[in-house]
Amino acid sequence: MAGLPHSPHAVVTGAARGIGREIAATLTRAGAVVTALGRQNAALEELIARGDARFSAVADVTDQAAVVAALKEAAARRPIDIMIANAGAAESAPFAKSDAALFKRMLDVNFMGVVNSIQAALPSMRKQPFGRIVVIASTAGLKGYPYVSAYAAAKHAAIGLVRSLALELASTRITVNAVCPGFTDTDLVAGSIDTIKKRTGRDHAEAMAELTRHNPQGRLVSPQEVSDAVLWLCGEGASAVTGQAIAVAGGEI
């Protein structure tokens, strides 16, 4: 299987924890030069100290000006070849109680954060002979789940962006894809389990079962399984794969 080209520069947003941290480490092990972007400088520096990233960039993906400045600095160090738009957040509420502020928060980070990251990276990427854009979406971008209508709407929007941008860039050497994890063993899902316990009175095992029942394999996905899918999409062997939303969810989708 064809791997990464020689030492590409990859920017990973939301790299301080969870799936983003695993993606940064996986790409680094595969030979990429990784810039880890996030809001928490201490966590990013820890990533670098472990050897799982080369550079850090502090920015909130919802702040367009901050993202542009951070990626301009990153591109000055080394032109950008790979953009992994991973940063995201989830909140749950019944639709009737999902106010405009909740929808705006979910769209700002899960959709506009993706837009801001890609737009800031593209000027550098267009000058390169190789390019990969991978958006970390969710199975919630491919189907519905109750009580997360704002989150699901934002993830559906992100996948729509991927499909449209892939066609727009098809004549270039830049591919655009989404990876859509099911419920994954991260802090974000741990928070969801705590929420289920508080709202329903269920114990940990029962709350976990509420999530794993969606996965035909009866388990949570691991961050490494998600990062392995990302690594494949970033490789030269995936040059003909673009505009796809690939579920990593044990057969749920």
Question: Which residue ranges define each predicted feature?
Answer:
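Conserved glycine-rich cofactor-binding loop
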Residues: A16-R17
